[in-house]
């Protein structure tokens, strides 16, 4: 067995195409998952049970099932419903890439929402009391105090989740 440089040169365009698809999945799923996670975070910290409970159920289901099962359900299960095949989303869900983006976004949203919630809960109460002493409203405290500190606290775990998403995006290929 010898090292065949010609085989590597011939395979390079296919490998580069795979890298492009992987990064496309990573960016699109990461952004959609982050937007979903922010919505879930706001539902979780709202203090309203009718927002908190559905978010908890969603997070419990998507964190409790393997991503491969979720991809199979999206790719093989959703087309079983006539309403899905007749919807405006069918051209996207008909393709494997669209199904992978949907499944990865839903899964990432569940994990990232818990990462962000941990960051929000990690903000020291004394800092929020200082904001109240300065006359800040609850909205101002959340925007100017909680969000920057929570972002800093959640960033290491979020970067780990982005790396996990990169690895999971290879399932599609």
Segments from the language model and where they lie:
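Transmembrane alpha-helices and adjacent helix-loop boundaries
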Residues: 1-172
């Amino acid at each position: 067995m010898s090292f065949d440089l010609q085989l590597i040169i011939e395979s390079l365009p296919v490998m580069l195409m795979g890298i492009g698809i992987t990064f496309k999945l990573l960016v699109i799923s990461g952004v959609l998952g982050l937007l979903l996670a922010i919505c879930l975070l706001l539902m979780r910290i709202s203090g309203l049970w009718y927002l908190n409970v559905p978010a908890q159920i969603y997070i419990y289901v998507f964190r409790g099932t393997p991503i491969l099962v979720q991809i199979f359900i999206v790719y093989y299960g959703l087309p079983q419903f006539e309403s899905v095949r007749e919807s405006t989303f069918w051209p996207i869900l008909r393709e494997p890439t669209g199904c992978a983006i949907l499944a990865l976004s839903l899964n990432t949203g569940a994990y990232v929402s818990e990462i962000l919630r941990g960051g929000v809960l990690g903000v020291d109460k004394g800092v929020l009391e200082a904001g109240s002493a300065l006359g800040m409203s609850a909205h101002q405290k959340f925007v100017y105090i909680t969000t920057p500190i929570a972002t800093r606290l959640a960033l290491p775990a979020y970067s780990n989740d982005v790396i996990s998403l990169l690895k999971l995006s290879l399932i599609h290929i």
